[in-house]
From Swiss-Prot:
Phosphorylated and dephosphorylated by MprB. The gene is mprA. This is Response regulator MprA. Signal peptide: none annotated. CDD domains: REC_OmpR_PrrA-like (cd17627), trans_reg_C (cd00383). Residues 129-227 bind DNA.
């Protein structure tokens, strides 16, 4: 059965262009012209992923993200926007988007990001994958549970993938380019700050009760999971 993608955009030309491109690449595509229609379609026939514009009438894309995430729905969401400022990208990620693509974009890039997003949705860990532990931090690839000491930590799909990479490589400095390629699925533009935003999310969540920092920046290189700063 083909993967089902819901495309949500108030611009008919954009909707039709994405429908043709995604359909040509083997996806089953549904269309919605605003956030209200999108939420109704999701509630009645949940897709496998959503391509979601930000600026729309009635209900914008960020509010759609917030409403879905507030109910615990982890539906994969790729946000599209005509605005490409740092604050706009952060707003999209904060609202719960899994990825962010500014307009205008190349269809090849959207398809690559969608493939990467769907790979993160369907992790290939086997049933016997062991839990990963570093000091008092534990991540279980099978149950998707994360704890620090006795405290449960709730992570989004992308946060989990990023922390899993770090905890699987303790005390090893991981370059920014390697993390972007493995977690997001391909090389991001070096000017993007998605990685920095998600590192900030992980730090806040893993240090929420005043625990010592474990995720450290190696300036000009990348990040490392270790007891003390490098």
């Amino acid at each position: 059965m083909p993967v089902r993608i819901l495309v949500v955009d108030d611009d008919r030309a954009v909707r039709e262009s994405l429908r043709r491109s995604l359909s040509f690449n083997g996806y089953s595509v549904e269309l919605a012209q605003d956030g209200v229609e999108a939420l109704d379609l999701i509630a009645n026939n949940r897709p496998d992923a959503v391509v979601l514009d930000v600026m729309m009438p009635r209900l914008d894309g960020l509010e759609v993200c917030r409403q879905l995430r507030s109910t615990g729905d982890d539906l994969p969401i790729l946000v599209l926007t005509a605005r490409d400022s740092v604050s706009e990208r952060v707003a999209g990620l904060d609202a719960g988007a899994d990825d962010y693509l500014p307009k205008p974009f190349a269809l090849e890039e959207l398809l690559a990001r969608m493939r990467a997003l769907l790979r993160r949705t369907s992790p290939d860990e086997g049933p016997d994958s062991p839990a990963l532990t570093f000091l008092d931090l534990t991540l279980d690839p099978v149950t998707r549970e994360v704890t620090r000491g006795s405290r449960q930590i709730s992570l989004t799909r992308t946060e989990f993938a990023l922390l899993e990479m770090l905890i699987a490589n303790p005390r090893r400095v991981l370059t920014r380019s390697r993390i972007l390629e493995e977690v997001w699925g391909f090389d991001f533009p070096t000017s993007g700050n998605a990685l920095e935003v998600y590192i900030g999310y992980l730090r806040r969540k893993t240090e929420a009760s005043g625990e010592p920092r474990l995720i450290h920046t190696v300036r000009g290189v990348g990040y490392v999971l270790r007891e003390t700063p490098p």
